[in-house]
A protein has these predicted regions:
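Nucleotidyl polymerases of mobile genetic elements and RNA viruses
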Residues: 1-199
């Protein structure tokens, strides 16, 4: 799996952690000050990220990423047939099938989510975008730690990155929580409207 994830994803990677991404962001904030440039960050929050992973879409994503069929088959068997019912003040509901969400507490769940998120980023084609920050000759426009995603750019082109990612996320049933998604800018920024909400 490590070959499937880009180096901007630090979640569940040996020798890497949240402090690495925090250090990267701090370094990125300091650098533009030297050159008197503005920098814009968008800290994205997915609404119920792990609960919204659609199983059927996940299997297709794993197939597209060429995860070996025998591993996908094992995962399908692990997720086959889960049912639940809800107890209310008026009794219990009928049993119903669960077709979404990765298993809470399962060691595989963050890995599966990482692959789901990687699929979103690839389809959003952020690696091809001009918006971003030049670091050692390389354009960097996102840093990730499992479900925590930070987009960055030197201009308000950041909005185009966010809209690309939001569009691709919604195709696989992940919704950007606009109320919890935050923008940070070192310079002036005009307020954005996304889904009728001002960011």
């Amino acid at each position: 799996m490590k070959h499937e994830l880009t180096d901007v994803q630090a979640g569940l990677r040996k020798g890497r952690g949240t402090r690495d991404q925090i250090a990267n962001i701090c370094w990125i904030i300091e650098k533009p000050r030297e050159f008197h440039k503005n920098i814009y960050f968008c800290f994205i929050d997915y609404a119920k990220a792990f609960d919204c992973v659609d199983h059927n879409k996940l299997w297709k994503i794993l197939q597209e990423m060429e995860i070996p069929d025998h591993l996908t088959c094992l995962l399908r068997n692990l997720y086959a047939g889960p049912e639940a019912m809800v107890r209310t003040g008026h009794g219990t509901t009928d049993w119903f099938q669960i077709g979404k969400g990765v298993r809470q507490g399962c060691i595989l769940s963050p890995c599966l989510f990482n692959l789901y998120a990687e699929y979103i980023m690839r389809n959003a084609r952020l690696d091809e975008a001009q918006a971003g920050i030049k670091i050692a000759g390389r354009n960097v426009n996102n840093l990730r730690y499992t479900d925590d995603t930070t987009l960055m750019a030197e201009s308000e082109e950041l909005k185009s990155l966010l809209m690309r990612m939001k569009e691709e996320s919604e195709k696989v049933d992940l919704k950007c929580n606009v109320q919890k998604t935050k923008i940070m800018a070192s310079g002036p920024i005009t307020p954005w409207q996304i889904d009728g909400e001002t960011m």
